[in-house]
């Protein structure tokens, strides 16, 4: 009741009894001073953050911002023999079988004229009465240092508010209950017939991935496609 029920129902907008067990099991309970969220032996984030990592990965690749894929689908699909789609799978098929359910998140970010707010990168608020689910204090992901290793005199915090998704909102989390999973399986059957498209990620696979798991899945998909492409090339020789 104190640690899980209020937080889970606030985040998902549904009674705990309607959530799959893996959602509840994601919340670790320890009687120690270990403040890690995960139990993995090795944990970390990219130096400089994920934005820097993605920028390094893109390199000289052309990036188009503020471009609706569906408005330019024919043109964009013609640019490559394979398309990797990580948006909502139901949106790809224009919701022809109905809308899947998602949770959305709203952020309120503040710059505080103080060196420390909560002493930790993330603090979750488990009571149901606090409107936000957690507060992120970004500097602690880099141990409170700037790019030159100097202490930062100010701090930036973001409060996260969970809400029900509706068309026009940004979807964040799939609602993996029985009803939605059944609808996803129908969309998956349609997706499997799209030979040109690889569906991936939380939205493309309608799966509540952790970051390490989704990176591993992306690498696996890339390797599988590379092997398939090599096999097709060899067969055509």
Segments from the language model and where they lie:
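Short FAD-binding loop at a beta-strand-to-alpha-helix junction that anchors the flavin cofactor
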Residues: 193-206
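Alpha-helical elements of Rossmann-like donor-binding domains used by nucleotide-donor carbohydrate transfer enzymes
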Residues: 52, 56, 186, 217-220
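Residues within well-formed alpha-helices
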Residues: 7, 217-221, 234
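A conserved FAD-binding loop/helix module that cradles the flavin
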Residues: 205-222
């Amino acid at each position: 009741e104190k640690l899980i029920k209020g937080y889970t129902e606030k985040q998902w907008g549904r009674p705990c009894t309607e959530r799959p067990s893996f959602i509840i099991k994601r919340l670790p309970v320890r009687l120690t001073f270990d403040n890690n969220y995960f139990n993995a032996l090795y944990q970390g984030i990219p130096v400089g953050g994920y934005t820097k990592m993605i920028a390094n990965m893109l390199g000289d690749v052309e990036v188009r911002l503020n471009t609706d894929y569906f408005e330019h689908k024919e043109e964009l699909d013609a640019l490559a023999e394979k398309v990797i789609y990580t948006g909502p799978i139901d949106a790809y098929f224009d919701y022809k079988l109905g809308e899947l359910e998602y949770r959305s998140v709203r952020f309120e970010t503040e710059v505080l004229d103080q060196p420390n707010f909560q002493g930790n990168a993330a603090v979750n608020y488990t009571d149901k009465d606090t409107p936000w689910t957690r507060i992120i204090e970004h500097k602690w992901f880099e141990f409170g240092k700037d790019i030159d290793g100097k202490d930062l005199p100010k701090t930036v915090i973001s409060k996260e508010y969970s809400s029900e998704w509706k068309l026009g909102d940004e979807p964040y989390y799939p609602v993996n209950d029985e009803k939605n999973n059944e609808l996803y399986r129908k969309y998956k059957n349609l997706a499997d017939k799209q030979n040109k498209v690889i569906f991936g990620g939380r939205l493309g696979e309608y799966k509540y991935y952790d970051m390490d798991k989704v990176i591993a899945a992306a690498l696996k998909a890339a390797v599988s496609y590379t092997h398939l492409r090599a096999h097709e090339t060899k067969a055509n020789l």
